[in-house]
Amino acid sequence: HIKGNKILMRKTFYVFVKPSKHIAEESIKIHQIRPIDLENGLDPQNAIYQLLDFIGSRPIVGYYIKFDVAIISKYTKKFIGIKLPNETIEVSSMYYKTRKRSSDYEFIDLKFDTILKNLNIPALGKHDALNDAIMTSMIFLKLKDVTPAKTTFYTN
């Protein structure tokens, strides 16, 4: 939860959701979440209601947020009949707009680790939803007041 220039850690949302199908071995390796960890997880409907209560009407800040919103919207559509209506803020787009380029075609590396490194933000444990949210919040706070770069030599 971001308020002003602070990340409020006492207001976090972190739950496990019972999967509706078998978890792929690759997913277990990446996320370090085993089937036994999910045995006491919430059913998807309960998890969605709790998530919506936590989010409220606030904007959602994320890294490649369209993917997350698409997954959440699949369930909000199923359970309450609408897609997730919240405004979204994409930190990779914020970062991109701050990078000075010598041409409109110059490559800007938008990998999460690259953004963290270039903004001098510590990398916490990866593929952990809470750590990812904290790092994404730090990126947002670092960039929210940065003026977009004049991107090319054609720009005044």
What do the predicted segments below correspond to?
Residues 1-78, 82, 109-112, 117-127:
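Conserved non-catalytic scaffold segment of RNase H-like nuclease domains
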Residues 82-89:
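Short hydrophobic/aromatic-enriched beta-strand-loop microsegments
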